[in-house]
Structure formats: structure tokens, C-alpha cells
Curated annotation (Swiss-Prot):
With its partner (PsbF) binds heme. PSII binds additional chlorophylls, carotenoids and specific lipids. This is Cytochrome b559 subunit alpha. It comes from Staurastrum punctulatum (Green alga). Its cofactor is heme b. It comes from the Eukaryota. The lineage of its organism: Eukaryota, Viridiplantae, Streptophyta, Zygnematophyceae, Zygnematophycidae.
Amino acid sequence: MSGNTGERPFGDIITSIRYWVIHSITIPSLFIAGWLFVSTGLAYDVFGSPRPNEYFTESRQEVPLITGRFNSLDQLDEFTRSL
């Protein structure tokens, strides 16, 4: 037989008014904050990923594939120089 840990049962937690008052504010706030983080472009700046219009430049329209096994660093340097 399992012992009592003294924790509140989950059923009591999700049926309490206090739980829903707190979570009815925090869950939509997190959703809105995430939407703003992505829609303003801040996510691109924070993680350093290129924006959708920056994947291909005017000078380079091909996909930057690494094709050589032994000269991959040279190919990477060439791709980054063209940016």
C-alpha cells in the first residue's frame, strides 16, 4: 500500500476556482508572448536564423549544399563569404 505524500490530489487542483483564475491569465499570456516573439522577428535575431527573404541572395540563388567530404570547410567558407 502506498503512503500519503501530503500532496493535494490532482482532481481537487483542477476543480478549484483559484487554479482557473491563475491559468486563465497565464496560458493566454504565454500564447500572446510567443506569437509576438515570432511575429515581430525577434526570434530570428535571438536564434540567429535567417529571415525567409534572406535564404537566397541576389548573387546566390542555388541551394548551398556541401558536396565534398574532405573539402567541406572550404565549401562552408565559400558559402559564408558570399553572404
